[in-house]
Every structure is written in structure tokens, then in C-alpha cells.
Amino acid sequence: MKDRVSITMLDGGIADVRLIRTDKMNALDAAMWAALVEAIETLKATPGLRVVVLSGEGRAFCAGLDLSSLQAERDPGASSAGGTLADRTNGIANNAQYAAWGWRELPVPVIAAVHGVAFGAGS
């Protein structure tokens, strides 16, 4: 998770969650979705959590889907850190779906601190 998403706990139960794939303007790939799911699960189990602030490192919040990662997934023999889009990894949802939906399951407000680019799945 640490190469795609970081969580820093601040005073007062504030979780600072950051997308950290600046070379691709925080574009989403299978590893990013898996890291977001892991972050959500970590936050669910964090005692004293009061609020989550989600932001992106660098000059963009999130450039949306990393299309090159989809091409790599189609290549025979390619392995993907977060599974394929077809894999149901979270009940009836895949990691990409749960990375978006899971924030709703947190019992605290989630604030998106959007700056710069925010396209498609990143908006």
C-alpha cells in the first residue's frame, strides 16, 4: 500500500490519506485500487477516528484511470497486484468498485481535498 497510498494520523482523530503516484498524476491502476481498499479497511479499524481527508500528492488529485494498466492486464501472462477487473474481491464488488464505495462504510465524514486534475474515476 505504501507505494500508492499513505495514511498519516494527525491530532484529533484526523486521518490524512494521500494518493502517491505523482509520476502518473495519481492515475488509478490495480495496485492503486488494492491500496485504497487496504486503506479503507485500516481506517475502519482505527479507534478514535473522527474524519478522513483524502488528497493527491503532486500537481493533481487524480487523473482517473491509467489506461496503460488496462492494456497490461490484457496481455497474456500479466499479473496484476490488485487482481483483474473481473475478480470479485469484495463480495459482489471488485477492487475498483470497492475503492469508490468503501468510503461510504466509514462511520466518519470523508472530505476530498481536490486540486488540479480530477478526471473520470478520480472525480
Regions found by a protein language model. Give the residues of each.
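Conserved CoA-thioester-binding segment of acyl-CoA-metabolizing enzymes
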Residues: M1-E57, E73
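Glycine-rich beta-to-alpha active-site loop
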Residues: Q97-S123
